[in-house]
Amino acid sequence: MTVVVVTGTDTGVGKTVACAALACHARQAGIEVAVCKPVQTGTQIGDDDLAEVARLSGVTELTGLVRYPQPLAPAAAAEHAGMALPTREQLLELIAGLDRPGRLILVEGAGGLLVELADASATLRDLAVELGALALVTVSVELGTLNHTALTLEALTTRGVACAGLVIGSWTGRPGAVQISNRSALARLAPMRATLPAGAGSMDATDFAAMSAAAFDRDWVTTLVH
């Protein structure tokens, strides 16, 4: 089973767009792709990451498990709604059920790597450990990103989860000294797999497909599937 968990150093750094871009690139490379967003919050304000991935990437194999109305961390959103978090076993079974020969499974978390997604404080990192998954980390280029990224990479390393690389979720067309410096420093922490333009999530499907095709190295993407 080939699983890549897509996480981020913070909320709002572009995980969903990064997930959609990788899914779109892989689809265009002839790889069968499934995208899983086990836990979705914020449905009452229209948050629907799987719908966004579908619109941008053209991938049709999309799977989720639980949806909470409030735009809060999953544990808080579940409590607010009077609902339970899923169990770790439910999440693992959901993801394992997507396995097919030659298929790439992308699993998008909620918030950062160590946000509780299931009961008993299970996190995306825990799922990655049990699935033998790689982790693709979506990052910012603003102040604070170097510490946030280093902490995320350290959290992966301590549990033996291999980092597939970094994706800059939003790169402005007119970067300043901070953004340029941080981009160079981030590339020294882990392989930089893609730099996505600011506003990519607002592109139509045709423009997004062209952007995604150019953003990632196809040879690297094809090595993900085994």
Curated annotation (Swiss-Prot):
Class in the EC hierarchy, top level: ligase
Pathway where this protein functions: Cofactor biosynthesis; biotin biosynthesis; biotin from 7,8-diaminononanoate: step 1/2
EC number in record: 6.3.3.3
GO cellular component, one term: cytosol
Cofactor(s) required, per the database record: Mg(2+)
Main location: cytoplasm
Active-site residues, as the UniProt record annotates them: 37
Record-listed ATP binding positions: 12-17, 49, 108-111, 169-170, 197-199
UniProt catalytic activity: (7R,8S)-7,8-diammoniononanoate + CO2 + ATP = (4R,5S)-dethiobiotin + ADP + phosphate + 3 H(+)
InterPro entries: DTB_synth_BioD, P-loop_NTPase
Keyword ATP-binding: yes
Coiled-coil stretches noted in the UniProt entry, renumbered to this chain: none
Subcellular location: Cytoplasm
Known function: Catalyzes a mechanistically unusual reaction, the ATP-dependent insertion of CO2 between the N7 and N8 nitrogen atoms of 7,8-diaminopelargonic acid (DAPA, also called 7,8-diammoniononanoate) to form a ureido ring.
Family the UniProt entry places it in: Belongs to the dethiobiotin synthetase family.
Protein name: ATP-dependent dethiobiotin synthetase BioD
Organism listed in the record: Mycobacterium leprae (strain TN)
